[in-house]
């Protein structure tokens, strides 16, 4: 039994001028294919597939626009990585679940019986269809407001199928910490070498990372780069509130040959 679409409008913070657009955005093709009355059999215009197609492009454009406006100092690579997370199925699935979108979908009997209301693909497709419906109903400003509230400023959603709300296979914690700070609109991480000890051929470095005035972590490593990664991992875990598998000395990108050039690794040597 699906919930009333009017209740979903309250969660979306948007009231449709044309309620038919919302109904169409919530209608899965399985309903039309089962030849139900009023389902618009044989007419692709009565399910959400075309809206999902449009919504995917609307979302990509609005996310890219918002990131360029919010972060004018970021390079293309930084923007691309952040955009990739925000438009990922994992993140959109989390957004859809927060809205309890599955309760509002119109499904055919086969999808209903197979647990379609909780299927990741159906929820993501439905969310993208809703974005398109809002765009068609209220214009780009309405769609922009929805994306800002429900996608850009949403909590950090990762790969829940791996049993956690964070990405389970992080190999570059500096990048992960930077993206997390961006997502939560926190200051960018700042790194500094606070201590060096040991002989020249076998030094140990202590690096501190700070995010604003409140968040900080320190870690040691046999290179500045390894120490920075470990410090980033420590602060990332604190911000996410979840432990992660320890980072080995020779993780990708952290070999001794990369002996930790401060400028390349983002570490600022202490004076």
Swiss-Prot record:
Residues 172-241 form the DRBM domain. One of its GO terms (cellular component) is cytoplasm. Residues 251-261 have a biased composition (Acidic residues). GO terms for biological process: mRNA processing; regulation of gene expression; rRNA processing; tRNA processing. It is an enzyme of class 3 (hydrolase). Its EC number is 3.1.26.3. Residues 241-271 are annotated as: Disordered. Its cofactor is Mg(2+). It is found in: Cytoplasm. Homodimer. The keyword GTP-binding does not apply. SMART domains: DSRM, RIBOc. It catalyses: Endonucleolytic cleavage to 5'-phosphomonoester. HAMAP family: RNase_III. Digests double-stranded RNA. Involved in the processing of primary rRNA transcript to yield the immediate precursors to the large and small rRNAs (23S and 16S). Processes some mRNAs, and tRNAs when they are encoded in the rRNA operon. Processes pre-crRNA and tracrRNA of type II CRISPR loci if present in the organism. This is Ribonuclease 3. Keywords: Cytoplasm, Endonuclease, Hydrolase, Magnesium, Metal-binding, mRNA processing, Nuclease, RNA-binding, rRNA processing, rRNA-binding, tRNA processing. One of its GO terms (molecular function) is rRNA binding. The keyword Transmembrane helix does not apply.
């Amino acid at each position: 039994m699906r919930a009333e679409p009017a209740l979903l409008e309250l969660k979306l913070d948007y009231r449709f001028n044309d309620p038919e657009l919302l109904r169409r955005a919530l209608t899965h093709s399985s309903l039309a294919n089962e030849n139900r009355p009023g389902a618009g059999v044989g007419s692709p215009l009565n399910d959400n597939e075309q809206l999902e197609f449009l919504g995917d492009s609307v979302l990509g454009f609005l996310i890219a626009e918002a990131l360029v406006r919010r972060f004018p100092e970021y390079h293309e690579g930084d923007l691309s990585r952040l955009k990739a997370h925000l438009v990922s199925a994992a993140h959109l699935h989390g957004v859809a679940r927060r809205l309890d979108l599955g309760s509002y979908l119109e499904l055919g009997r086969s999808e209903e019986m197979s647990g379609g209301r909780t299927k990741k693909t159906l929820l993501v497709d439905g969310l993208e269809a809703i974005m398109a419906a809002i765009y068609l109903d209220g214009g780009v400003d309405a769609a922009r407001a929805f994306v800002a509230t429900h996608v850009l400023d949403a909590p950090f959603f990762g790969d829940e199928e791996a049993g956690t709300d964070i990405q389970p296979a992080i190999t570059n914690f500096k990048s992960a910490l930077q993206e997390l700070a961006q997502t939560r609109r926190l200051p960018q991480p700042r790194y500094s070498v606070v201590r060096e000890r040991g002989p020249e051929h076998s030094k140990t470095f202590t690096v501190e990372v700070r995010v604003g005035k409140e968040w900080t972590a320190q870690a040691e490593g046999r290179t500045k780069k390894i120490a920075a990664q470990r410090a980033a991992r420590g602060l990332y875990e604190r911000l996410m509130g979840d432990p992660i598998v320890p980072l080995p000395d020779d993780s990708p990108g952290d070999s001794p040959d990369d002996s930790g050039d401060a400028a390349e690794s983002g570490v600022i040597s202490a004076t």
